[in-house]
Design a protein with these regions (language model features):
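Core alpha/beta structural scaffold of self-assembling particle/tube/pore-forming proteins
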Residues: 2-58, 84-373
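N-terminal low-complexity, intrinsically disordered segments
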Residues: 57-81
Length: 373
């Protein structure tokens, strides 16, 4: 019996909608997919428009005052509002099947489902790796309109030769080797309130723990009770720490040395391990991110330098945003006159990362980056 192209399209479309669990294993590249989880879970935001925009008040002008009876007033209006502007980044993948593959498996339910699911899973895996890779790096340059704004774009290291902790993270180190201070449309070089907290460390010891304590304390801003909090806090635990394997190992070793009994408590007093062995710092989980294993920057002399960074991210203020109606959109199976026996499904989406408050979004602690000799 002849099977028409339209029947094959319908078969592919209806099967793809409700694939059962596959009977094959995948050799994953990454141990964790933190960015992907944020994009797929309740922490993501949904937005529309030609770009992602938010307003932010960066400073005040000291107009409040105590007054005496019958004092005169001098009302003024100050322009302290700035606009955060983040472009959309488009991402996509595709998966294809030849008519002969489909025909050879159409009488075997298991074979047909494995054919469809394995092809889709391989491409979804590729998509996840790309999202994760770019989520832990800055774009190629200040004019790069292809890649999203990864975590290092918003949470910057101290400048070369700087070691004093504070809200001094202002220089974006782009993947292509250039630098800049304009972050999401606002110049951190001119606006000191549009900078993140950064500090340096030498060894993994009590001095580093003190540095972490101070960073946590200084980035936890609480508004006065009579001022409405404009943040977008969501459910669940929004704060996590991230590091590469070398630093995670050293922090776990430090935790073991601090508590021989290995009883479940906090690293600032005793060790607290979760099921996969990562420690907690001030009740904040420390997660291993394989992309940070190979993170390097250029020092003052232009040489590659490994900062071995510890990132802390508050996902209430550094938000993953997807475009309304255009995220993980799967097309109908399509054919092309140049490959008339091939059916292709396209998966597309539009997203980026948005930081609404760089002072509250987290911090980074890294090895001092050498200045130019």
């Amino acid at each position: 019996m002849k099977v028409t192209a339209s029947q094959l399209v319908d078969l592919l479309a209806t099967t793809l909608e409700d694939l059962p669990k596959g009977q094959f294993e995948v050799m994953w590249d990454s141990q964790n997919y933190k960015i992907c989880r944020i994009l797929q879970e309740h922490r993501r935001q949904i937005d529309g428009g030609t770009s992602i925009q938010r307003n932010v008040i960066l400073d005040r002008n000291g107009r409040a005052r105590y007054r005496r009876l019958f004092d005169t007033d001098s009302p003024t209006v100050d322009q302290n509002m700035k606009t955060i502007d983040v472009p959309w980044a488009q991402i996509g993948t595709d998966y294809s099947w030849d008519v002969l593959e489909i025909m050879r498996n159409r009488n075997s339910e298991k074979g047909f489902i494995n054919l469809l699911e394995s092809r889709r899973t391989e491409r979804m895996w590729d998509l996840a790796e790309l999202i994760e890779e770019r989520g832990w790096s800055a774009p190629e340059s200040a004019t790069d309109s292809l890649y999203p704004y990864g975590i290092p774009y918003y949470i910057n290291f101290l400048n070369d030769g700087e070691t004093e902790a504070g809200f001094s993270g202002r220089t974006i180190r782009y993947s292509g080797g250039t630098t800049g201070t304009i972050c999401a449309g606002i110049d951190a070089g001119a606006e000191d309130k549009w900078r993140n907290y950064a500090a340096t460390r030498t060894n993994v010891d009590n001095a580093m723990l003190r540095t972490i304590r101070q960073a946590i304390r200084r980035t936890r801003f609480r508004p006065p009770p009579f001022v409405q909090n404009p943040g977008q806090d969501g459910p669940g635990t929004p704060i996590e720490m991230y590091a590469g394997d070398v630093l995670v190992n050293e922090l776990e070793d430090l935790a073991d040395r601090r508590d021989d009994n290995n009883t479940p408590d906090d690293l600032m007093g005793k060790v607290l391990h979760n099921y996969d062995g990562a420690v907690y710092i001030n009740r904040i989980p420390l997660c291993y991110v394989p992309q940070l294993d190979t993170q390097t920057v250029l020092d003052g002399d232009g040489n590659e330098f490994s900062p071995e960074a510890l990132y802390c991210v508050d996902w209430s203020y550094l938000q993953a945003v997807v475009q309304d109606g255009y995220w993980m959109e799967e097309s109908e199976p399509q054919t092309d006159r140049g490959q008339h026996t091939t059916f292709t499904v396209f998966l597309d989406g539009s997203h980026n990362n948005l930081c609404i408050n760089r002072r509250r979004a987290g911090f980074v602690i890294h090895k001092p980056i050498p200045a130019a000799a």
